Amino acid sequence: MKITRQKHAKKHLGFFRNNFGVREPYQILLDGTFCQAALRGRIQLRDQLPRYLMGETQLCTTRCVLKELETLGKELYGAKLIAQKCQVRNCPHFKSPVSGSECLLSMVDEGNPHHYFVATQDQNLSVKVKRTPGIPLMFIIQNTIVLDKPSPRTVAFVKAVEAGQLVSVHEKQSIKQLKEEQGLVRNPDLRRRRRKKKKVGGPNPLSCLKKKKKAQDTKSPASEKKRKRKRIRNRSTLKVSSEQQGAEG
């Protein structure tokens, strides 16, 4: 049973890898229901998931999932501990948390650009995930981890792309670049370039003024010394002339 289960997982992974760019490390988004099922089945996720998927994995969750487990109380305390050990991915609900299922759906929205796996026991969430092509779905059944086969919507999408009826991933990227060039989509790289251009400038006029003031200050004491020396010489000549006049008299 274990060998056939791994064969199915290898086949499904190959499908998602070839058609949707899924690659290692496999990023698996866990919700509270999956953590609770792993706790009841005594499944060591960090050990068993890499063996089952035959590759490096990263266990991930979101702040909304952690907040949901925290509000549910002591009954899901063990599941909360499992989720807290996962890497927390940033979600758009930092100020106003939503339910765990809604949050995970938002993480795989717009074509699942980060190639997340969704691991859940929630049937409603599973149905919604299957409606979006290209999202690997995982669940636990009879204390064993299972990677679900590609959904009918996913298979139909791949066939339509191969037949030329839908836009492929590469074409979507080129369309996005054109929109960025026309200013329809904000490009973070352009922002960085603009910021760099603003930083480049001429010398600060205030610094130039300070330098001139310093130069004037250095000249002023020298001129005062010269004037003092001239006065001293005049006084000495007057003394000599007075002494000569006294001697003649």
Curated annotation (Swiss-Prot):
Keywords (A to Z) from UniProt: Isopeptide bond, Nucleus, Phosphoprotein, Ribosome biogenesis, rRNA processing, Ubl conjugation
Record-annotated disulphide pairs: none
InterPro entries: Fcf1/Utp23 (IPR006984), PIN-like_dom_sf (IPR029060)
Residue segments, region Disordered: 180-249
Predominant location category: nucleus
Highest taxon in the source lineage: Eukaryota
GO terms of molecular function: mRNA 3'-UTR binding; mRNA 5'-UTR binding
GO terms for cellular component: nucleolus; small-subunit processome
Cross-link (Glycyl lysine isopeptide (Lys-Gly) (interchain with G-Cter in SUMO2)) at residue(s): K179
UniProt record, GO biological process: endonucleolytic cleavage in 5'-ETS of tricistronic rRNA transcript (SSU-rRNA, 5.8S rRNA, LSU-rRNA)
Polar residues bias spans: 237-249
Compositionally biased region (Basic residues): 191-200, 225-236
Modified residues (Phosphoserine): S174
Subcellular location: Nucleus, Nucleolus
Assigned protein family: Belongs to the UTP23/FCF1 family. UTP23 subfamily.
Function: Involved in rRNA-processing and ribosome biogenesis.
Protein name: rRNA-processing protein UTP23 homolog
